Design a protein with these regions (language model features):
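Short, acidic, metal-binding catalytic loop of nucleotide-sugar glycosyltransferases
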Residues: 21-30
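Short, flexible, basic/aromatic active-site loop/helix in glycosyltransferases
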Residues: 110-111, 128-151
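Glycine-rich, basic loop-to-helix element that forms the pyrophosphate-binding segment
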Residues: 58-74, 156
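Conserved donor NDP-sugar-binding/catalytic core segment of glycosyltransferases
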Residues: 91-124
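Catalytic donor/gating beta->alpha subdomain of glycosyltransferases that bind UDP-sugars
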Residues: 116, 173-178, 182-234
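A conserved acidic beta->alpha catalytic loop
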Residues: 22, 36-45, 86
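A recurrent flexible, glycine/aromatic-enriched loop bordering the glycosyltransferase active site
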Residues: 140-161, 177-178, 204, 234-237
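Short aromatic/hydrophobic "clamp" motif used to bind/position activated sugar donors
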Residues: 79
Length: 335
C-alpha cells in the first residue's frame, strides 16, 4: 500500500520544523508528504528545506479547502492527516496500516498525546478533562451510530482514510470554519456503513494550548463549529445534546436578565438556583477527579472550574453562531 500524508498549514513557522523533522524519520519509498500551505510567514520556506515534501501554495480559503486539495493531489491508497503543531512517532504509519489490515477498516484514528506533558495545568487539562479536548484511547474502539455520541471521536490531526472513500465523493465539508469538520465527515461515513476504528497504538504528540485564553477561545470556536454540524446533521445523535444544553442555558440567562428588571425576588430565586446547580456540578466533578481519576489535589480543585468555564463558552459559541445565522437569514429575506 502507498501512503499519502497531507498537512494543511497556515502561519505555522513556530511549529512546523518539529513536525517536518519527525516526518523525515518515517519517510519511505511508499510514503509521500503533501503540504498545502496558505501562510504569510516563513512556513513555506521551512517546508521547502525538506526535499521529500511536495509543497502546494494556496490562497487563504480555509482548512478544509486545503485538506481537499491535498486529497486530490494524493497518490496513496491510504491518505493520512496530521497538523503542523504535531510530532509523529516513528511507528505511526506502521501502526495505522496494521489496524487497517486487522479490522478491515475504512478509517483509522487515535490519540493526540500532550507534547508538553507536565508543562502546565492548562496543557495537561486537554487530555485529562472530563470531556477532553484531545482524546486518549486506552483500548481499540469501533464506532457505530450508537457509540458515536458516547465516545470522543478521533481528532483531525490523527486520521487516516482509505482513498476509495474520497473516490466515492466523501470530502471535508468546506463550509466548516471553526471545528466539527472531521466530526461531520466521520458521521456521514458512520451513517452510511463505513467502519471507523480508533486504536491506542495510533497516536501523535500534539502541542496543546499553553494559555488559558487560548484554551477558552478554542472552546468558543468549537461551539461555533458544532452549530454548523447541528444545522447540517440533525439526524446525528451527537448533534442534539449540545443544542439542547445551549437552548436551556440561553433560557436561564434570559430569565435571569428579565427578572432583574421585573422582579428582584424572582431574580434572587433564579440566581440562587443557577448557583446551586453550578456548585453541585463542581462538587460532582471534584469527587470524580479525586476518587475515580486519582489526580493531584490541585487538579481536582481546578479542573472542575475549567470544565464548567469551557463548556459554558462552548454553549456561548453555539448560540453566537445560531444568532448570526438567524440574523443572516432575516437580512437575506428583507433584501
Amino acid at each position: 500500500l502507498k501512503v499519502s500524508i497531507v498537512v494543511a498549514t497556515r502561519n505555522c513557522e513556530k511549529y512546523i520544523k518539529d513536525l517536518m523533522d519527525s516526518l523525515a524519520k518515517i519517510v519511505e519509498d511508499y510514503i509521500e508528504v503533501i503540504v498545502v500551505d496558505s501562510s504569510e510567514d516563513s512556513t513555506p520556506a521551512i517546508v521547502s528545506e525538506y526535499g521529500f515534501a511536495k509543497l502546494i501554495r494556496l490562497e487563504k480559503l480555509g482548512l478544509n479547502v486545503a485538506r481537499n486539495v491535498g486529497v486530490r493531489e494524493a497518490k496513496g491508497d491510504i491518505i493520512v492527516f496530521t497538523d503542523c503543531d504535531c510530532v509523529v512517532p516513528k511507528e505511526w504509519i506502521e501502526n495505522i496500516l496494521k489496524v487497517f489490515k486487522e479490522e478491515e477498516a475504512h478509517v483509522v484514528g487515535g490519540s493526540a498525546v500532550n507534547f508538553y506533558e507536565g508543562l502546565s495545568l492548562i496543557t495537561d487539562y486537554a487530555n485529562e478533562g472530563i470531556w477532553s479536548v484531545m482524546p486518549i484511547y486506552r483500548e481499540r474502539i469501533v464506532f457505530d451510530r450508537d457509540s458515536f455520541r458516547k465516545v470522543r471521536l478521533p481528532p483531525g490531526n490523527n486520521l487516516a482514510f482509505k482513498k476509495e472513500i474520497f473516490d466515492k465523493g466523501y470530502f471535508f465539508d468546506e463550509e466548516y470554519r471553526w471545528g466539527s469538520d472531521e466530526v461531520d465527515l466521520l458521521w456521514r461515513l458512520c451513517r452510511d456503513g463505513f467502519k471507523i476504528v480508533a486504536d491506542p497504538s495510533v497516536y501523535v504528540y500534539h502541542k496543546h494550548r499553553t494559555s488559558l485564553l487560548e484554551l477558552l477561545k478554542q472552546e468558543f470556536r468549537y461551539g461555533m463549529g458544532h452549530y454548523t454540524f447541528f444545522k447540517k446533521n440533525r439526524d446525528s445523535p451527537l448533534a442534539w445534546p449540545a443544542a439542547i444544553g445551549s437552548y436551556v442555558f440561553a433560557l436561564f440567562l434570559a430569565a435571569l436578565f428579565t427578572s432583574y428588571f421585573l422582579s428582584p425576588l424572582a431574580f434572587l430565586i433564579i440566581g440562587l438556583f443557577m448557583a446551586t446547580i453550578t456548585v453541585e456540578v463542581y462538587l460532582t466533578l471534584f469527587f470524580y477527579y479525586f476518587k475515580r481519576r486519582k489526580l493531584r489535589l490541585k487538579k481536582c480543585f481546578l479542573y472542575p472550574i475549567l470544565d464548567i468555564t469551557c463548556h459554558a463558552l462552548y454553549l456561548f459559541g453555539f448560540l453566537y453562531s445560531n444568532i448570526r445565522d438567524i440574523i443572516g437569514r432575516i437580512s437575506c429575506r428583507t433584501k
